[in-house]
Design a protein with these regions (language model features):
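C-terminal engagement/docking regions of AAA+ P-loop ATPases
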Residues: 4, 11-15, 252-296
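Pre-Walker A (pre-P-loop) alpha-helix and adjacent loop at the N terminus of AAA/AAA+ ATPase modules
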Residues: 16-59, 80, 296
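Short helix/loop segment immediately N-terminal to the Walker
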Residues: 43-58, 214-217, 255-264
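Walker A/P-loop
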Residues: 53-91, 115-118, 184
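Conserved C-terminal "switch" segment of AAA+ ATPases
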Residues: 85-90, 172-175, 181, 190-234, ...
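Conserved P-loop NTPase "ATPase switch" module shared by AAA+ and STAND
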Residues: 97, 120-139
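Conserved catalytic/switch belt of AAA+ P-loop NTPases
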Residues: 131-162, 166-181
Length: 296
């Protein structure tokens, strides 16, 4: 019978969101899970063509990582990727935090949470710093969590919920509600970036912004990133974004001063030099200064 035999066609994916996700630095675990979800969706389609029953698996996720590790960026791209593959109907993302889910009075949270799930139908509900819902130990947060757990089951075929936040706090968050933990299918870790990865992220940002740097400048940027990694809460990808933004401003100031009433070549406008980059946003250790007189 024709429906007993289905040809599997493995086409090279060319969808922009998927390629953009694959191009991101690091995140091997995230990319692997994305491919598994897409493969499962394709398999369910083929089973349906064969007349077999379909299985709608839960795809709720937990993103655990420090600030600047691309959790929100990945969630936004993932919503588009899953829309392209018809896993999600609309592929939009509803982003919210504690202030968006907790009401002023008992009973309000349930209505607010329900409205968020309604808004996210056919897409992703992204809850950032979800642990803040239970940190204050007040009734409102607990009410919101209990409603979220209930709606995760009610909307499991229409909404993918992604919880995101700091690793340790997310672990404590799950321990406070067993029903919540059991409904999360994927626990994805977003590790801090290494100096090499931060420099690669800078390369991608430069390419996207139509700037470039020479090898000497790249070596300096690697050194800056290595110093940043030794600091606590340095910001990961956000640090690189700020580093580049400051470099672009310094380059602009330099070129305007150098070319007053003159002409500027396109190559110069695209080139960032080593002098344009400097450590920003982190406290430097104070250098000891010698005070006194030298013997003659």
């Amino acid at each position: 019978k024709e429906k007993d035999l289905i040809k599997i066609e493995l086409k090279k994916k060319t969808d922009k969101p998927y390629l953009e996700l694959q191009k991101m630095v690091g995140l091997s675990e995230v990319k692997k899970v994305t491919d598994e979800i897409l493969a499962a969706a394709k398999m369910q389609k083929m089973r349906k063509q064969m007349g077999l029953s379909g299985v709608q698996s839960s795809m709720h996720m937990l993103f655990s990582g420090n600030p600047g590790t691309a959790k929100t960026t990945v969630a936004r791209l993932l919503s588009q990727v899953l829309k392209e593959e018809e896993v999600l109907k609309y592929g939009h993302i509803v982003e919210c935090g504690r202030q968006d889910l907790v009401g002023k009075y008992v009973g309000w949270a349930a209505q607010i949470v329900e409205s968020k799930f309604q808004a996210a139908r056919g897409g992703i509900l992204f809850i950032d710093e979800a642990y803040s819902l239970v940190e204050d130990n007040r009734t409102y947060g607990a009410e919101a969590i209990n409603t979220i757990v209930q709606e995760m089951e009610n909307y499991r075929d229409e909404v993918i919920v992604i919880f995101a936040g700091y690793p340790e706090k997310m672990k404590e968050f799950l321990e406070q509600n067993e029903g919540l933990a059991s409904r999360i299918a994927f626990h994805l870790n977003f590790p801090d970036y290494s100096p090499v990865e931060l420099t690669q992220i800078l390369d991608l940002m430069l390419e996207k912004s139509e700037y470039r740097m020479d090898e000497r400048t790249r070596e300096k940027c690697f050194s800056i990133c290595a110093d940043a990694c030794r600091e606590e809460n340095y910001g990961n990808g956000r640090f690189v974004r700020n580093l580049l933004d400051h470099a672009i401003m310094r380059q602009a100031d330099r070129l305007i001063r150098e070319h007053q009433n003159g002409t500027l070549e396109k190559e110069e406008a695209c080139l960032l030099t080593a002098d344009d980059f400097e450590m920003i946003g982190l406290k430097k250790k104070p250098q000891s200064r010698q005070i006194g007189f030298c013997a003659g």
